[in-house]
Amino acid sequence: MLLRRRTRIPRVWPVLALILALAVTSTSWQPAHASPAAGSGQAVPPPPKPEPIKVRQLPLPPVTPSIEAGSCTTENNPRGTGCIGQSPGLFSGNFLPDSRNIVATVLFTGAPAAPHPSSIYTGQQLILVRADGTTFPNGDAWKCVTCGIPPGNAPGPADAMDYPQAFGDGKRVLAGTNIIDCGPYKLADRACTPQRVRIYPIRWNTTADGSGPGGSIRELRLHPDDTHLGFSSMTVTGGRLDQFSYMGRLQFNPSPTTGTPLVPRYDLVKVSRLFDPNATQPVDVDPSDPGKLRFDPFVPSVGELRGFSADGREVTYVGYPAESSNIDVFAADLTTGKVRRLTADPEYVDPVDLSPDGKWTVVMDTRGTDRLSFLSAMRGVPGITDLLSASAISAARNNGKRRFFQPYLIDAYGDRGSYAGQRLNAAGDGSPGSINDPLWNGRADPKWSPDGTHIAYWQSLAVAPDCGGQNPLPCPVSTAPGGRTERLMIADLTSRPPQTREPVVPVSDTVPWGVPYEPGSAIPARTHLTQGTYTLDGKKSGSAEVTVTENSTRTAISTVAVTYQDYSDDGRYVINGTETMTLQNDTPFHNKIDWFSDLVRTDIGTGRVHATKRTSPDGFHLDITVGTNKFQATGTLTTTVDGHVYNQPANGT
């Protein structure tokens, strides 16, 4: 069955000998004290010792060098079970409940024309990949679940099948806006054949009368109760790109009478928006004194939903920066709204998965690369200018399709002191194709096995135009089978015994700190500070004077200017100086930022200058488009911490 790719906003062989590497610890150098994860309610223990990790590359279908019909021959694949291209369109997902199989989607290509039996291996398809070195009965280390589905078994729209996630019953997979179902059969069983597989679309009703195709949903994440679904939906507020996250119940509708498509489908019902415009926001006016601001990143502020804890109690998300220019992931209790900060490294993170026992976090993070440290390495600066810069900083994490992510394992207490987690794929010599080759970059999402002994992740290689040509980074030559530019990896946590997953806690259809969504209701405008001058008091000492200027239509903030005077939240360091930022958007996706900074962070006890954050005299001017993610700037912004200088990346890199 051919599944066409739907346009998305990016944020986007034969069995080979397993590649093994013993991973040693890799602790990112932290330029300053990193706060532990909040909300533990317990004394924070010392960081864990490095543990032994072996990383293997898992097999995928063989590669055909051409995408022409018929180019996948028995010479490429003697079993006639299909080929993928050098750019295989890989999306790695989670494990089936047996911890032996990983769900993934790939783009098959080069199939012969029908009625050849191998003609079914074409287009985007769901596959299972053996994670334990064994094979399926036909001798392949993978099984295509959807290849050859009769058209009547998938009557809905052919939407992209990204971010595949297996249900706990082992019989169903969420892939894109579809649920792939093998009825009473487990997907890995021989009895689960394409003739028994059904694909059902998911629809979110957004009209009062139930008409139309429903709302646009993205970044879907399955709740571990197999009943609820988290998702995000983009919008525009005040001419700027915005996004809200939601949680709803999946309800099978075998015979819909309203809305499209009019085919058996899953409807999202009892939906809650994880944003309440009437609740306290991370940066808000003090209700007892309208001239003062309150800054609290530990109120629920879901920027983009990223998943759930294994027991289902918490939702994970990219949150409002707890420190200026430092984008982290958080977890909020779905009932109480209590928030934990999962990461605190100055670099960028968003892909995240919590371990089955709830004691560990795995992330894809730019830590160790210094990609964004020129913005964020000075610690303890409250996220005030982030009212304008969050989207642009998020876009700067990539260079086009080139990512800078690597997988890190962090304990539940988070980054602290010099501890910044353990890199899963640290071992190796960094040579082309090695486990720790820096040009193989992580993608979303890393996933734990249900028994807690493995972590699956996938990577892509930098390719033109994000290298080569005018780009100063030469394009690497792939050493992967067939020269493909994506690979599926598994990290074996060899010293860990199999775990028992935490029981899933029943959750309500209503999130108390969210707002029930009424189909047809207007999308709320995200509130913003009104024009004026405010004072933000440091938690320990000092203050910051914050001047907010709105745009000409008073629909959004255009400029934020901050003057710090002996400002301190931790009682160890004070911040002095000024920072001013202006944002212009000629389209919702295009950000032009004018940034002037002259900040100094000083040790209270000794008076020693610990860090500075300064722009060149003419300022730092960033021009970047969300989705394109090409870094272009004039002027400089430089952060220095204890003599360590962090410079911005070169334009186009």
Pin down the residues of each PLM region.
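Secretory targeting and sorting signals
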Residues: L2-A34
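Sequence signature of WD/YWTD-type beta-propeller architectures
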Residues: A38-T653
